[in-house]
Amino acid sequence: MTKLERQVTICNKLGLHARAATKLAILASEFDAEITIVQGEKKASAASVLGLLMLETGMGKTITLLGKGQDADAALDAICALVDAKFDEAS
């Protein structure tokens, strides 16, 4: 099975905080894919809010999205769009 990889920069003011992590985890869970988020030496399942929070990803940090599974391409597209939209937050 092919593994896909994308990079995206966190651009919202508060970074990957609880509300943003929850939105990302809910979105990732909607796809038939295993998505892993990597930031530096840390990695977490995109479906785990706690794991995402433990990445301690702030504004300006670049994360790598790794995906595998039937819907991996669509999942990575959707997650990149969410991050680029600043998790639908005002800042």
Swiss-Prot record:
Pfam families, per database record: PTS-HPr
Highest taxon of the lineage: Bacteria
Gene3D superfamilies xrefs: HPr-like (3.30.1340.10)
Active site located where? 17 (pros-phosphohistidine intermediate)
One Gene Ontology term, aspect cellular component: cytoplasm
UniProt KW Cytoplasm keyword:
yes
Q: Which UniProt keywords apply?
A: Cytoplasm, Phosphotransferase system
> Could you tell me which residue ranges the HPr domain spans?
3-90
Q: Kindly list the places in or outside the cell where this protein is found, as annotated in its UniProt entry.
A: Cytoplasm
Q: Name the family the entry cites.
A: Belongs to the HPr family.
This chain's function reads: Component of the phosphoenolpyruvate-dependent nitrogen-metabolic phosphotransferase system (nitrogen-metabolic PTS), that seems to be involved in regulating nitrogen metabolism. The phosphoryl group from phosphoenolpyruvate (PEP) is transferred to the phosphoryl carrier protein NPr by enzyme I-Ntr. Phospho-NPr then transfers it to EIIA-Ntr. Could function in the transcriptional regulation of sigma-54 dependent operons in conjunction with the NPr (PtsO) and EIIA-Ntr (PtsN) proteins.
> What is the name of the protein in this document?
Phosphocarrier protein NPr
In its UniProt entry, the species of origin is given as Shewanella violacea (strain JCM 10179 / CIP 106290 / LMG 19151 / DSS12)
What is the organism lineage in this UniProt record?
Bacteria, Pseudomonadati, Pseudomonadota, Gammaproteobacteria, Alteromonadales
